[in-house]
């Protein structure tokens, strides 16, 4: 069994999934990023599968996506690269918030994603040598 919730973290709303009963227990953690024009809620099946495997999962919405979507679909298309770059920049704050919550077991933090989220994960790995695993 797992638990899944939306909550405030690092100044924004994230989807947070974890094995049931382990909300406050340090676990290996995956920050998972969704694709362009999508949201963490649409990609929540990744959170379910990873939490069932024993991971803590944190899924933020990219700028102008999900809970952060302001309604400008046409403009968003023209801001793809800015959105991708901001997504990568926000990782530092998100990682610090995850550490402050004492959610990491032995510093085991991975990043992953699909589509634009995969590009985000790869970009984070090139800039954050402390991240040892990506998917």
Segments (PLM) and residue ranges:
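The serine-hydrolase catalytic nucleophile loop
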Residues: 36-48
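Surface-exposed, active-site-proximal loop segments in enzymatic domains
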Residues: 71-79
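N-terminal cap/lid segment of alpha/beta-hydrolase-fold proteins
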Residues: 1-25
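Short beta-strand element of the alpha/beta-hydrolase
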Residues: 25-35
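Alpha/beta-hydrolase active-site loop
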Residues: 78-102
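Short, well-ordered alpha-helices that flank and scaffold nucleotide-derived cofactor binding pockets
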Residues: 48, 52, 126-129
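Primarily recognizes the serine-hydrolase "nucleophile elbow" in alpha/beta-hydrolase
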Residues: 94-135
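Conserved alpha/beta-hydrolase
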Residues: 50-71
């Amino acid at each position: 069994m797992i638990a899944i919730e939306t909550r405030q973290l690092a100044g924004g709303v994230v989807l947070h999934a974890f094995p049931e009963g382990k909300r406050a227990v340090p676990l290996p953690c995956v920050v998972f990023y969704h694709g362009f024009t999508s949201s963490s809620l649409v990609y929540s099946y990744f959170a379910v599968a990873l939490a069932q495997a024993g991971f803590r999962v944190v899924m933020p919405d990219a700028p102008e996506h999900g809970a952060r979507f302001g309604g400008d679909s046409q403009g968003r298309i023209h801001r793809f690269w800015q959105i991708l770059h901001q997504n990568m920049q926000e990782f530092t704050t998100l990682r610090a918030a995850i550490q402050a919550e004492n959610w990491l077991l032995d510093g085991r933090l991975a990043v992953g994603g699909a589509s634009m989220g995969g590009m985000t994960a790869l970009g984070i790995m090139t800039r954050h040598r402390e991240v040892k695993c990506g998917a």
